[in-house]
C-alpha cells in the first residue's frame, strides 16, 4: 500500500463516517494526504484530517478522529490506528500491505512515480536563454541543470513540456560583441565596452577562416558579415556545451525573428486594440502599472526604435498563439523586476497573469581550497559551464546545481564534489545504485531471482523504513512538480540511499557459505530490485547517470 493508496482509503473512510454522522462531506479537501511522522513510535503514517475538518463540519476534532480511527482499523492492510494529541490519526500498516509497494514498483518499472495530474497541460519552459556573446556562465549553468530537471519532472506528471531557448540576438550587446570580434581580427585592443577572453580571439579567427575578405568590406557590410558568422559560431558553441551537459532544447527562438517577422508590430497592434498603450513624450508606453507593475514601460522609444520589452511582448504572444497554457520563465538573480513586468504584459493581452510563472535563481560560487574561484582561463572574468564540467564532471555538476532551492545562493566545493566519499551527495546516491546492481549480479550467480510471493516476510524495522521511503517517491514527484522544486528529488534520493545502506548493514540479502536460500532472501532481493528502480528513476529525472559499477 502506497501513501497515496492510504490517503485514498482515509478519504473514503471520511466520506462514510461523515455520512453516517449526518455531517457535510462537501467539507472534505479535494486531496487528502498522509505523512511520515517524525517519531517512528507514532506509526508508519499520520494525518491531521480530523483537525482540518472539525470546525468545518461542527465536530470536535478529537472525537472525529476517534470515529475515523474506528472504521480505519477494520480496513484490510491496517495493523493499528491510534488517535493522538488534538486529533492526529496515526496508522500502522501490516507487513503484507506495507510490502505491496514492491510489486507496484516492479510492475511500473521506469514509470513508477508518474501520474496524469498535469495531463492536457501544454507548458512552455524557457530557461538559460543566455546572450550569444560568450560561453554559458555558472549562473546560466544552474538553469541548464535545474530547467532540464524541471522539464523532466513536469513530464512525469503528464504535462506536454516544450523546452525553449530564447536567443537574444538583437540589440546593443550583439553590436558590442561584433565590435570585439572585429578588434580581435585586426589585432587591436578590446573596445572599452567590449567582450574579453580567449574565446573572442578564437571565434574571430574562425570568422576570418570562413570570410577572409570580411575586413576589406565597407564598414556596414563588414559589421554585418562578422556579426552573422560570429553569432552563429558562438551559438553553436553554446549548444554544444549544453548538449554535452545533458541539456537539449525542443525549440530555439531568435529574438531577431520577432522583429524581422513583424511579430513585434503585431503585438503592438493588439495592445492598441485593447487600449493598453498610449503615446507620451514621443514614445509609446504600455500601461503595465494598471496590471501590478511599479510603473508603465516604454515599448517604442522616442527615436522610433523598439525597446527591449517589445521583443518580450511579441515573444509572449507568440507562445500563446502556439497554444501554451502555462509559460514558465527561469531568470537570473538580477531579473526580479521582470516578474511584475511579464505578468502585467500577459494581463495587457487579456490573459490571466497566472499563465506566467517566473522563477528567479540565485548566485553560484565555486570554492577551491576554501577560496572562491573568480577567474576562467577562457572567458577571463566569469566561470563557465565548461569550467565546472572540467573540474567535477557532468553528473556532479548537474546534481550540485539542482540539489538546492533556486532561491538560495550556493557554493560548490570542488574538492567535495569530485571526491569518492559518502560526504559527496551524488557519489552517495550513485554508490547505492551501484551496490544494488552488484547485489543483483551476485544473486544471479547464485541462481537466485527476486520473488514477490512472500513479501509479508519483510518485517524487520530496517525493511519497513526502506519500504516506506520507496513508497513516498510518487508523492515526492507530485509535490516537487507542483512547487517547481526539483531539488526535492535530490534530497529524497539521499534519504532513500541512506535507508538502503542501513538496511544492507542489518539485513543479509544473500545466503552465506552453505546456507540454503530461503523465501526471505528472495523477498529481500525483490525489495532491492524495487529500491534500485526508484533510484534509477530519480536520477533520470535529474539527468544524472545511474552507474552499475563504481
Curated annotation (Swiss-Prot):
Known EC number:
6.1.1.19
- UniProt short sequence motif 'HIGH' region, positions renumbered to this chain: 130-140
Compartments where found: Cytoplasm
Give a GO molecular function annotation for the protein.
Answer: ATP binding
Q: What is its main location?
A: cytoplasm
So what does this thing catalyse? tRNA(Arg) + L-arginine + ATP = L-arginyl-tRNA(Arg) + AMP + diphosphate
The EC class name is ligase
A GO-annotated cellular component: cytoplasm
| Keyword set, alphabetical order | Aminoacyl-tRNA synthetase, ATP-binding, Cytoplasm, Ligase, Nucleotide-binding, Protein biosynthesis
> One biological process GO term for this chain?
arginyl-tRNA aminoacylation
Top-rank lineage group of the source organism: Bacteria
Instruction: Please give the InterPro entries that the UniProt record associates with this protein.
Output: aa-tRNA-synth_I_CS, Arg-tRNA-ligase, Arg-tRNA-synth_N, Arg-tRNA-synth_N_sf, ArgRS_core, DALR_anticod-bd, Rossmann-like_a/b/a_fold, tRNAsynth_Ia_anticodon-bd
Record's keyword annotation contains Transferase? no
What is said about its interaction partners and assembly? Monomer.
Similarity annotation? Belongs to the class-I aminoacyl-tRNA synthetase family.
Its protein name is Arginine--tRNA ligase
Amino acid at each position: 500500500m502506497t501513501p497515496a493508496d492510504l490517503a485514498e482509503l482515509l478519504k473514503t473512510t471520511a466520506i462514510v463516517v461523515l455520512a453516517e454522522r449526518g455531517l457535510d462531506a462537501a467539507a472534505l479537501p479535494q486531496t487528502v494526504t498522509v505523512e511520515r511522522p517524525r517519531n517512528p513510535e507514532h506509526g508508519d503514517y499520520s494525518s491531521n484530517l480530523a483537525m482540518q475538518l472539525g470546525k468545518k463540519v461542527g465536530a470536535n476534532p478529537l472525537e472525529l478522529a476517534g470515529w475515523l480511527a474506528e472504521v480505519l482499523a477494520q480496513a484490510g492492510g491496517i495493523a493499528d490506528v491510534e488517535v493522538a494529541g488534538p486529533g492526529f490519526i496515526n496508522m500502522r500498516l501490516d507487513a503484507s500491505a506495507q510490502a505491496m509497494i514492491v510489486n507496484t514498483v516492479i510492475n511500473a518499472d521506469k514509470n513508477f512515480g508518474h501520474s496524469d495530474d498535469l495531463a492536457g497541460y501544454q507548458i512552455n519552459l524557457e530557461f538559460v536563454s543566455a546572450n550569444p556573446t560568450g560561453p554559458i556562465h555558472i549562473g546560466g549553468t544552474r538553469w541548464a541543470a535545474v530547467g532540464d530537471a524541471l522539464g523532466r519532472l513536469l513530464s512525469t506528471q503528464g504535462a506536454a513540456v516544450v523546452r525553449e531557448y530564447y536567443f537574444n540576438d538583437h540589440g546593443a550587446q550583439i553590436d558590442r560583441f561584433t565590435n570585439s570580434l572585429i578588434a580581435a581580427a585586426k589585432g587591436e585592443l578590446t573596445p572599452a565596452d567590449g567582450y574579453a577572453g580567449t574565446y573572442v580571439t578564437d571565434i574571430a579567427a574562425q570568422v576570418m577562416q570562413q570570410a577572409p575578405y570580411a575586413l576589406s568590406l565597407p564598414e556596414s557590410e563588414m559589421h554585418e558579415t562578422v556579426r552573422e558568422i560570429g553569432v552563429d559560431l558562438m551559438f553553436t558553441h553554446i549548444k554544444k556545451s549544453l548538449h554535452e551537459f545533458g541539456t537539449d532544447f525542443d525549440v530555439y527562438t531568435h529574438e531577431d525573428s520577432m522583429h524581422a517577422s513583424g511579430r513585434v508590430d503585431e503585438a503592438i497592434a493588439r495592445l492598441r486594440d485593447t487600449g493598453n498603450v498610449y503615446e507620451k513624450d514621443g514614445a509609446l508606453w504600455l500601461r503595465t502599472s494598471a496590471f501590478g507593475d511599479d510603473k508603465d514601460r516604454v515599448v517604442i522609444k522616442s527615436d522610433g526604435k523598439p525597446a527591449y520589452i517589445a521583443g518580450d511582448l511579441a515573444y509572449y504572444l507568440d507562445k500563446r498563439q502556439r497554444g501554451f497554457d502555462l509559460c514558465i520563465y527561469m531568470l537570473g538573480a538580477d531579473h526580479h523586476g521582470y516578474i511584475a513586468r511579464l505578468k502585467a504584459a500577459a494581463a495587457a493581452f487579456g490573459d490571466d497573469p497566472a499563465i506566467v510563472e517566473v522563477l528567479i535563481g540565485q548566485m553560484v560560487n565555486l570554492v577551491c581550497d576554501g577560496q572562491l574561484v573568480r577567474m576562467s582561463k577562457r572567458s577571463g572574468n566569469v566561470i563557465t559551464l565548461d569550467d565546472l564540467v572540467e573540474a567535477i564532471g557532468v553528473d556532479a555538476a548537474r546534481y550540485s546545481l539542482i540539489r538546492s532551492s533556486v532561491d538560495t545562493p550556493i557554493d560548490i566545493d570542488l574538492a567535495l564534489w569530485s571526491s569518492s566519499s559518502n560526504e559527496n551527495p551524488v557519489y552517495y546516491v550513485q554508490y547505492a545504485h551501484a551496490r544494488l546492481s552488484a547485489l543483483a549480479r551476485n544473486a544471479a550467480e547464485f541462481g537466485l531471482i527476486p520473488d514477490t510471493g512472500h513479501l509479508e516476510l519483510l518485517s524487520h524495522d530496517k525493511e519497513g523504513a526502506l519500504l516506506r521511503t520507496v513508497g513516498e517517491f510518487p508523492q515526492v514527484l507530485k509535490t516537487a512538480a507542483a512547487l517547481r522544486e526539483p531539488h526535492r528529488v535530490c534530497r529524497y534520493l539521499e534519504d532513500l540511499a541512506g535507508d538502503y545502506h542501513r538496511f544492507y548493514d542489518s539485513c543479509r540479502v544473500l545466503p552465506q557459505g552453505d546456507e540454503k536460500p530461503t523465501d526471505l532472501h528472495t523477498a529481500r532481493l525483490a525489495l532491492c530490485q524495487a529500491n534500485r528502480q526508484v533510484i534509477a528513476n530519480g536520477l533520470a529525472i535529474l539527468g544524472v547517470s545511474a552507474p552499475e559499477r563504481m
